[in-house]
Amino acid sequence: MMIPLHLLRSLEPVTGVCGRSLSYAGARVPAKTQNIINGQWVDSSTDRWIDVHNPATNEVVTQVPQTTQAEMEQAVESAKGAFRSWSKTSAMARQQIMFRYQQLIKSNIGELAKLITLEQGKTLADAEGDVMRGLQVVEHCCSNTNLLIGETMTGVSKDMDLPAFRTPLGVCAGIAPFNFPAMIPLWMFPMATICGNTYIMKPSERYQLVDSDANKCYLATS
């Protein structure tokens, strides 16, 4: 089954829990980020890159591609293709994926918070709060299947019943701001995908690492 997540800007995969082996003091990160399109890590063909700095040392911790129009359109087409199967996946099956995602985020809050501190400069306590507030929405998504059930009102008029159906919208997209790099993306794509939509996520170009690892966890749930 294809996971309906297509990140326009993300981090190349490395080993470890959720795809990373990280120590806070000397975090090893790649020189350039990659895109995720159709569930695959893809190098950008752009020749324009944005440096992401550690605010404590001014060290460049990664470079973010200014993703091309063609790459964006490729992500859209991929999301359209994934929607055909994902929208027909049962709500219970989508719920099981969200349960696994919730557990992976919860188990790696500390590591995700370190990435926020590395690239944004928040204290670890603030960074953990950033992740935790996003996790709360993911936990809500786990119970959202009860809200996806249609309903039927009988006898609304003579010989008339009124059924209601809840169906996915299609391909959705979100652009995340810089100030809460974990929390706000976790407000966006989990809610859309649990409802059967596919999603194109564009995280802030200033803070890539935590979004990348959070979405590695999502890809790992398949």
Q: Model segments located where?
A:
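Terminal low-complexity tails and localization/encapsulation signals of metabolic enzymes
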Residues: 2-63, 96, 150-175
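Ser/Thr-centric signal marking residues that sit
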Residues: 33, 57, 89, 117, ...
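Signature tryptophan residues that serve as conserved aromatic anchors
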Residues: 41, 83-86, 178, 187
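Alpha-helix N-cap/helix-start motif
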Residues: 45, 72, 109, 127, ...
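Proline- and acidic/polar-enriched loop/turn elements at helix boundaries
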Residues: 47, 91, 117, 128-129, ...
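Glycine-rich loop-to-alpha-helix module at the N-terminal edge of alpha/beta enzyme cores
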Residues: 59-149, 159
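Rossmann-like NAD(P) dinucleotide-binding subdomain of oxidoreductase/dehydrogenase enzymes
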Residues: 150-222
